[in-house]
Amino acid sequence: MIRYLMCILLLLSVVISGCGKTDKITETAAETQNYTVHDIRGKKITFAKKPERIASSFVYADEILLDLVDHQKIVGLSKWVHDPGLSMGHKQAEDVPGIVENNLESVIALKPDLFFIADTAKKEYIDSLEDAGIKVYVFKYISRLDEIPDLVKGIGEAVGEKEKAETLIKTMNIKINAVKTKVAAIPQKQRKTGMLFLRFGAIGGAGCIYNDILSTAGIEDCYQQARPA
């Protein structure tokens, strides 16, 4: 979904160069050992080595993991990452057959040594996963464009791939800055008004990541004006 949103942004601004697959990042030889991270809850999670059975229940995290870790280390992703209408990572995910369903049994069956889940999940569900001995990294559900780098950074630190995460963030910022430069050259009178449609309908409005995308691309979001009174 993140790359899908970035692709929308680049297309809207008529940036021709790449929004497809992120260039493969070279594997580092050294394995990070004995490291500790904190998730959005402030919970401390300690690793003796990089996790080798990683699972995720949310498409944002799915796509980031596909770019950060060897796919053989991913035992399960959400079903949404396999949907070409929602995820630019669906082809990358073809070699990850495991599907994380929205139930405790599905996750436990995958035997992950690290599980990513958004903070929109019920506390009782997260507690049950941890009671089953699973390390759970809870991340903030992102709703704004400028929240993406923190998500990438946090996931990168959790899987022991901090440098790769920094490279992804740098690549994203380069693309966004290229969009802003292009938009800055467009006279105000030539700016467009528009609205984003996904297959389930129109989406947008102030405080929404889709509104951020349109604004960054120099397009006025008319979602609020178009909504029925």
Predicted regions span which residues?
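Positively charged n-region of N-terminal signal peptides that target proteins for export
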Residues: 1-5
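Bacterial N-terminal signal peptides
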Residues: 7-15
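Bacterial Sec-exported substrate-binding components of ABC uptake systems
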Residues: 18-62, 163-194
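Extracytoplasmic substrate-binding proteins
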Residues: 34, 124-202, 223-225
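A short, structured surface patch at a secondary-structure boundary
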Residues: 53-119, 219-222
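Solvent-exposed loop/turn segments at secondary-structure junctions
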Residues: 60-64, 80-83, 114-115, 120-124, ...
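Alpha-helical, coiled-coil/dimerization segments enriched in small aliphatic residues
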Residues: 81-85, 205-229
